[in-house]
UniProtKB/Swiss-Prot annotation:
The gene is MZM1. This is Mitochondrial zinc maintenance protein 1, mitochondrial. The keyword Mitochondrion applies. It comes from the Eukaryota. Assembly factor required for Rieske Fe-S protein RIP1 incorporation into the cytochrome b-c1 (CIII) complex. Functions as a chaperone, binding to this subunit within the mitochondrial matrix and stabilizing it prior to its translocation and insertion into the late CIII dimeric intermediate within the mitochondrial inner membrane. Modulates the mitochondrial matrix zinc pool. Interacts with RIP1. Keywords: Chaperone, Mitochondrion, Transit peptide. CDD domains: Complex1_LYR_LYRM7. GO terms for molecular function: protein folding chaperone. One of its GO terms (cellular component) is mitochondrial matrix. PANTHER family: COMPLEX III ASSEMBLY FACTOR LYRM7 (PTHR46749:SF1).
Amino acid sequence: MTAPALSARGAYRQILRATRIAFHEDTRVLLAARQEARRQFDEHKRVGIDTPMQINHAIEVASILKHNIVQGVKLEGDEAAKWELRIHDDIERGDNDSIKHAGKDIKIHKACSA
């Protein structure tokens, strides 16, 4: 096998692992995510100029699924509509201080139309 084929297989496996982590206990969404991943890989199965970009995209998708997707489950019998979040060990956690200071160092210049 060629190097792109091996790395494409690795990217596909990363997506499968990430979907298992992100959609644990949600079989319907897990199967839909895996079907979509399979469909996307089948659409782009020929090696071409954009193959490395497609592989990189797949790896980024796997990372987002693994580190940034949190599912919520509505608690049964609760009229106030309380939700429980399924936060796993791989979820990226930020603190409020980083949010408060985000973008403060950015200088805004003249508008494009000026």
